[in-house]
């Protein structure tokens, strides 16, 4: 095979992927789709440029245009989230978490985070960014019934450990975390309050979730490609806290600490996404939550065990389903089978699962943000729930269901809540 043929194969795989994705029901809770305008920015000549440091204070020449874009981004992000500062340089959510841990803590400091089985992100763990910083990692007490942090036990743990940092947020995140209740306790013992908003950043921007900075968080870290429908990347947002020296340490941890150049084409895409969210974000986020609730209710009606019934199932983009009663391999069986039908989601540990069950966990994690962005409403969630039932409960041939999924999804080919296509219209 010639090298040109390798090139052709790669381009063909990309084309195949794009067609496949446009005709699947993508319910991965950590993904989204960008608008044509954002896609244009990411594919721009900004990808060829290198920049280090702050706008207008670069270590490289030739940055006058990228500087202007980044300054617009700082303006838009601070307006969108009501923060005093916005740093668009992190290149992922984990990279933002690294910067926060390195800027605000020292090796040997104590941290309280959410356990992986309870929805905590791997970067918060001893084997992730927190551990790489040398933190002594402890986990929040968790109430399995409430599917949330146990506030009373958490208060006691904070006072007992006197941690340097406490971390809210995670990857399994159907309900707001008790920031307002626990932030004052953390600050009593001198701890920083960090909120990892990777999954819910778009809902916060759209005023449909808790407002961490107003509830007591010192700093928000996040990725920019989940409910916030931008390109893959990260961001750090914070109010003024502590001494100027502390903020300087945080900024120093970002550059030169955990990154140098910050992928300027993705930065430009983040900026346009922030503008889209200022224009359309409240309507988008509200519909995301409506769709999540509608899907949860529809799945329950179809016979699935949906977590959180007594709390309205969800207040975010996520729906959590326990499929352990359907097959011994549970999520490890269900997710691949649904993929055959063109329904893409992921298996997930539930709070009562031991870590050893990571490959065959009890749960499925479902996110509706991307299907919302392509114009789906509550009635469409009922269709999706029925597709899932046909595969997992009725044991229908996934390939047969795939044909119906393909036809259903073909009707949703525009990206709404954007300057390119505006708002979707209900049928």
UniProtKB/Swiss-Prot annotation:
Pathway: Amino-acid biosynthesis; glycine biosynthesis; glycine from L-serine: step 1/1. Its EC number is 2.1.2.-. GO terms for molecular function: glycine hydroxymethyltransferase activity; pyridoxal phosphate binding. One of its GO terms (cellular component) is cytoplasm. It is found in: Cytoplasm. Its cofactor is pyridoxal 5'-phosphate. (6S)-5,6,7,8-tetrahydrofolate binds at residues 120-122, 243. The modification N6-(pyridoxal phosphate)lysine is found at residue 226. The keyword Zinc does not apply. It is an enzyme of class 2 (transferase). Its main location: cytoplasm. The keyword Membrane does not apply. Keywords: Amino-acid biosynthesis, Cytoplasm, One-carbon metabolism, Pyridoxal phosphate, Transferase. The record marks 225 as: Plays an important role in substrate specificity. GO terms for biological process: glycine biosynthetic process from serine; tetrahydrofolate interconversion. Belongs to the SHMT family. Catalyzes the reversible interconversion of serine and glycine with a modified folate serving as the one-carbon carrier. Also exhibits a pteridine-independent aldolase activity toward beta-hydroxyamino acids, producing glycine and aldehydes, via a retro-aldol mechanism. Homodimer. NCBIfam families: PRK00011.1 (NF000586). This is Serine hydroxymethyltransferase. It comes from Thermococcus gammatolerans (strain DSM 15229 / JCM 11827 / EJ3). The gene is glyA.
């Amino acid at each position: 095979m010639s090298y040109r043929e390798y090139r052709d194969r790669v381009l063909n795989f990309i084309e195949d992927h794009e067609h496949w994705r446009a005709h699947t029901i993508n319910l991965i809770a950590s993904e989204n789709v960008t608008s044509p305008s954002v896609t244009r920015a990411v594919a721009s000549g900004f990808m060829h440029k290198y920049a280090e440091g702050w706008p207008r204070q670069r270590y490289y020449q030739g940055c006058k245009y990228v500087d202007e874009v980044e300054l617009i981004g700082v303006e838009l992000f601070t307006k969108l989230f009501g923060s005093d500062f916005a740093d668009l340089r992190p290149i992922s959510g984990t990279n933002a978490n690294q910067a926060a841990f390195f800027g605000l803590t020292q090796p040997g400091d104590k941290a309280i985070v959410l356990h992986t089985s309870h929805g905590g992100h791997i970067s918060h763990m001893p084997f992730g960014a927190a551990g790489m910083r040398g933190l002594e990692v402890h986990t929040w007490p968790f109430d399995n019934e409430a599917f949330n942090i146990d506030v009373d036990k958490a208060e006691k743990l904070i006072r007992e450990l006197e941690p340097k940092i406490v971390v809210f947020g995670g990857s399994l995140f159907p309900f707001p975390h008790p920031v307002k209740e626990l932030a004052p306790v953390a600050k009593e013992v001198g701890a920083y309050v960090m909120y990892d908003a990777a999954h819910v950043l778009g809902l916060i921007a759209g005023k449909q979730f808790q407002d961490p900075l107003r509830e007591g968080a010192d700093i928000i870290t996040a990725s920019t490609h989940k409910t916030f429908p931008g390109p893959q990347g990260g961001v750090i947002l914070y109010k003024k806290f502590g001494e100027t020296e502390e903020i300087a340490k945080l900024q120093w941890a970002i550059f030169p600490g955990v990154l140098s150049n910050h992928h300027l084409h993705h930065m430009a895409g983040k900026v346009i996404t922030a503008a889209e969210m200022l224009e359309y974000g409240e309507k988008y986020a509200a519909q995301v939550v409506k769709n999540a609730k509608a899907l949860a209710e529809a799945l329950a009606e179809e016979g699935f065990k949906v977590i959180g019934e007594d709390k309205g199932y969800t207040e975010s983009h996520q729906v959590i389903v326990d499929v352990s009663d359907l097959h011994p391999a549970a999520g490890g069986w269900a997710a691949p089978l649904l993929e055959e039908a063109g329904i893409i989601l992921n298996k997930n540990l539930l709070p009562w699962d031991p870590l050893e069950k990571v490959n065959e966990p009890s749960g499925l994690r479902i996110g509706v943000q991307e299907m919302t962005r392509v114009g789906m409403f509550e009635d469409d969630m009922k269709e999706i729930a029925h597709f899932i039932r046909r595969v997992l409960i009725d044991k229908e041939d996934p390939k047969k269901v795939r044909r119906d999924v393909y036809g259903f999804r073909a009707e949703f080919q525009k990206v709404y809540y954007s300057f390119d296509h505006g708002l979707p219209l209900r049928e």
